[in-house]
Curated annotation (Swiss-Prot):
GO MF terms held by the record: DNA binding
GO CC, any one term: nucleus
Record protein name field: Sperm histone P2b
Key words, A-Z: Chromosome, Developmental protein, Differentiation, DNA condensation, DNA-binding, Nucleosome core, Nucleus, Spermatogenesis
Primary location class: nucleus
Domain of life the protein comes from: Eukaryota
Disordered: annotated segments: 20-41
Known tissue expression: Testis.
Family: Belongs to the protamine P2 family.
Biological role: Protamines substitute for histones in the chromatin of sperm during the haploid phase of spermatogenesis. They compact sperm DNA into a highly condensed, stable and inactive complex.
Species this chain originates from: Equus caballus (Horse)
Alphabetical GO biological process terms: cell differentiation; chromosome condensation; spermatogenesis
Subcellular localization: Nucleus; Chromosome
Length: 58
């Protein structure tokens, strides 16, 4: 867990991540839930989505 957190911190600054999350949350709240209907895939989708969201654009 520790290595994962250090990796996240290195890639994306907390302030920018927070701002990005707040702005995206409203717009994609409805749309995002659809793709993963299965209970098993929801966690995976969420994890991938979060990583991509914070680190994709620099």
């Amino acid at each position: 867990a520790g290595s994962y957190y250090s990796y996240r911190r290195r890639r994306c600054s907390p302030r920018r991540l927070y701002r990005l999350r707040r702005r995206r949350y409203r717009s994609s709240r409805r749309r995002r839930r659809r793709p993963c209907r299965r209970r098993r895939h929801r966690r995976v989708c969420r994890r991938v989505r979060r990583r991509r969201r914070c680190c994709r654009r620099r």
